[in-house]
Amino acid sequence: MQTAMKLYGLFGIACLSAALTISSCAKSERRTSGWDVKFEDWPLTDCSTSTRPVRDLVAYKVLGVPYKWEEDWLSGTTYIIKPDFNGTKSSFSYKDYLEKNLCSGTHGAYENLIESKTDMIIASRDISRNELKSANDVGIKIITKPVAIDALVFIVNPKNPVRNLSSDQVRKIYTGEITNWKEVGGVDHTITPYIRDTDSGSQEKMETLVMAGLTMIDGTYMPEIIGSQMASPYLQIEMDEYGIGYTPFFYCTAMVRDLIKVNMLSIDSVVPSKESLKNNTYPFVSSIYAAIRETESQESIAHKLFQFIFTKSGADMIDESGYIAIKD
């Protein structure tokens, strides 16, 4: 196993640094997967907020639609992938595309798949126990498979001098055992630990991947610490020099980038990076998943798309999005 990248007293990592290779090749050449797929035959898809770029990039590449990364003017907090015809006329309708390709968030995407409102999803996590129960209750079996590597990272305000926490310190902050930054080498000030809403992919990963059964702080009586959107931790940390939050690595490095300046902390002295995610030296590595109903016809475009993303061509597209494809 490769030696982990270490961080000892160096400045924190802004999300911008890991995004440079993505922004440097903003537009793709027109290319398809070899399929003869018309847009009107394209399946209904859904996704998490953080997996939207990979879902969209695969769709554009298969359909032969050129694309570019650009700031999402609606949110103002992320970059997204959009069609790029560079002023030329095209029959492709972005409005029609958005109607067939939803972005309902992790829990919403699984709900739509269970309720047959969509045909295939790419989500930031595996199906949860509650979602699995909902599927079982209506006699639906969901097939899920990890498609790419991600991680849960911890972010702080750039003015916060803390640059590294141990896994144990993170857990103690979120159980309420550690309450002051001076206990972890910072200034003498109370820590504000921000959390996410219950059904979010980030919260589920925090509880299972990081806390591993430990009881987290309860936001019931502190609603101000609960973030309801993917951008919430960033907006909270931007305004709070003494806060800490968590977010997917890809969302931070590929989507937020420089729009909101935060520092990613190293954990156990390992910097979150593509290298440390690939070699699994960063402690909180996770996966994103593709999911489909078991009853989906093998002749359907949805089923063929599900199979395609696990091929070499599919993996190349996932890598192009900035994610790290899981390759057999």
Regions picked out by a protein language model, each given a short descriptive name:
Residues 25-328:
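Exported/periplasmic ABC-transporter solute-binding proteins
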